[in-house]
A protein has these predicted regions:
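Intrinsically disordered, low-complexity terminal regions enriched in Ser/Thr/Pro/Gly
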Residues: 1-147, 155-157
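Structured core of small recognition/catalytic domains
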Residues: 119-181, 245, 256, 260
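A cross-family detector of function-defining hotspots
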Residues: 223, 231-251, 256-266, 271-316, ...
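Early exported N-terminus immediately downstream of N-terminal targeting peptides
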Residues: 194-245
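Low-complexity, Pro/Ser/Thr- and charge-rich linker/hinge segments at domain boundaries
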Residues: 75-99, 186-212
Length: 346
């Protein structure tokens, strides 16, 4: 038995909701061992607000556990994104994600554009990694120029169109050729968001390896075995190595699920900080971005990372770290801890 509730606020600083409601969901499973999605809807009264902050809470009444999501709906700069919804082409079930693995086939619902022709462009994303937290570099960005153009026609009755997403990159669709406002689908690696192959494991390992170490593993006849050897040498025994691998790549997958923008979550600034430093003790969010605090908030020894939201035509989940040379010592301490096989939570 789960209670779903929401509270809608005018902005991030508001304390009194303009609307709230809740509902109970009781799930009767014929086979408890099989995971299934429960999809429904709950009508909202937003008082005519075009933009508001929504807090959604799901509470398991049997287990006395809950999960909360806070998001801004109708953010300025979002443009036309909310008019599009990707669904499974086989059964029409919403995918609730604009990031899909390469090779996916997707159907997009956009009833507001029935019968219209949409102009599409594919943009590649830089293949590199974000710079360390203390340097002046940045994170991978989309290419300014599209490498291919295409058009799709929205079904005049169903209000849908289908796409075959074979090539990685940003597939951006816009109703007007001269206006970049539109909707983007992000095509990532085949295993996204999980770490499924040796190649998936090697990429994030670059954060804690030197260039020669990385190249040696890349050129090894058995890459997965070489990666396991790296962790075993770092940890000193198999049990510690297994635990370090589990936690390191769990953070990679967690970054993919929460921080993916135009690049996989582990290749973003927030993903970088999460993998190396762990989960912050405190997070502050507002329309400008996020602040992560590791340690006690009023302690002068804490670490505070500030991420600034970037407005662009493709995504509203692109936050860039304000890098600072003062982070250099903490960065190398954490990297060295990982290299010694110790799971570090700052």
């Amino acid at each position: 038995l789960v209670r779903l509730s929401y509270h809608a606020y005018t902005d991030w600083n508001a304390r009194t909701p303009v609307d709230s409601a809740s509902m109970l969901v009781e799930d009767f499973a014929t086979d408890p061992a099989v995971d299934q999605d429960l999809i429904g809807s709950l009508a909202m009264r937003n008082g005519g607000l075009r933009s508001y902050v929504l807090q959604i809470t799901a509470r398991d009444l049997h287990r006395d556990a809950q999960s909360t999501l806070v998001m801004q709906v109708g953010r300025a700069g979002d443009g036309l994104r909310h008019y599009f919804l990707p669904v499974d082409p086989q059964n029409g079930v919403p995918l609730f994600d604009d990031h899909l693995p390469a090779g996916s086939q997707v159907r997009v619902r956009c009833e507001a554009f029935k019968g219209r022709t949409l102009f599409g462009a594919r943009h590649a994303v830089e293949p590199g990694l974000p710079a360390p937290v203390f340097t002046s570099g940045g994170s991978p960005r989309p290419a300014d120029t599209a490498d291919s153009l295409f058009q799709v026609t929205v079904d005049p009755v169903e209000g849908t169109f289908d796409l075959d997403l074979r090539a990685p990159g940003i597939h951006h669709l816009q109703p007007e050729a001269s206006n970049p406002e539109g909707y983007s689908l992000f095509v990532l690696t085949e295993a996204y968001p999980v770490v499924g192959t040796a190649t998936d494991m090697l990429g994030p390992l670059r954060y804690i390896t030197s260039r020669p170490e990385h190249e040696r593993i890349l050129g090894a006849p058995d890459m997965r075995k070489a990666i396991e050897t790296f962790w075993l040498d770092a940890a000193g025994d198999r049990e510690r190595a297994r635990e370090a691998i589990r936690i390191y790549y769990a953070r990679v997958e967690n970054a993919n699920r929460h921080f993916t923008s135009h690049a996989e979550g582990w290749r973003t600034d927030r993903g970088l900080v999460h993998i190396i430093f762990g989960t912050p003790n405190t997070i502050y969010r507002n329309e400008r971005g996020e602040t992560w605090i590791f340690g006690e908030e009023n302690n002068l020894m804490n670490l505070t990372f500030t991420f600034v939201r970037q407005n662009g035509p493709y995504t509203n989940n692109d936050l860039v770290l304000q890098r600072d040379p003062m982070f250099k010592g903490a960065w190398y301490r954490n990297v060295e801890s990982w290299r010694n096989g110790r799971v570090y939570q700052n």
